[in-house]
Amino acid sequence: MSKITEQVEALIQPVLNDLNFELVDIEYVKEGKDHFLRISIDKEGGVDLNDCTIASEKISEVMDENDPIPEMYYLDVASPGAERPIKKEKDFYNAINQPIFVSLYAPIEGDKEWLGVLKSVNDESINMEVKEKAKTKEIEIPRNKIAKARHAVMI
């Protein structure tokens, strides 16, 4: 997490708590000449457009008061969607028995990307049930090899 996203998280977490929203992700990026602060929120039962609008207004107030970002930026508050990122420890535990997609720094069994059902999580690794051709098998992936993980929609 960058210094800016850490500062933003510290500022907006109390606001989101008051609104009963969970902070899923913060991303501060430059695209072309524009900067974007993207904040993903969620709550029990999911968020709708009205929830995102309310959160955006409250976050804007706090950001304007404290001004942690020196350049102009666009604020985007949205739902994390069906393929929400899995970043925090609790995200992995909440994803047990759900389909996930994992991208790795280095290949395991010849592949750097795995799609399957998360079966278990511990401090060192995750276990996924994956399909390989017509067979189902379980693989263990060390946590330190995971570059990115997200929920997945399997059809």
UniProtKB/Swiss-Prot annotation:
Query: Highest taxon of the source?
Result: Bacteria
Gene3D superfamilies for the chain? Ribosome maturation factor RimP, C-terminal domain (2.30.30.180), RimP-like superfamily, N-terminal (3.30.300.70)
Q: Which GO terms describe its cellular component?
A: cytosol
Key words of the record: Cytoplasm, Ribosome biogenesis
First-listed, main subcellular location of the protein, grouped into a coarse class: cytoplasm
InterPro entries reported for this sequence:
Ribosome_maturation_RimP (IPR003728), RimP_C (IPR028998), RimP_C_sf (IPR036847), RimP_N (IPR028989), RimP_N_sf (IPR035956)
Location in or out of the cell = Cytoplasm
Biological process terms from the Gene Ontology for this record are:
ribosomal small subunit assembly; translation
Q: Name one Pfam family in it.
A: DUF150_C
General function of this protein: Required for maturation of 30S ribosomal subunits.
Q: Which family does it belong to?
A: Belongs to the RimP family.
Identification of the protein by name: Ribosome maturation factor RimP
The species this protein belongs to is Staphylococcus epidermidis (strain ATCC 35984 / DSM 28319 / BCRC 17069 / CCUG 31568 / BM 3577 / RP62A)
Q: What lineage does the source organism belong to?
A: Bacteria, Bacillati, Bacillota, Bacilli, Bacillales
Give the gene symbol: rimP
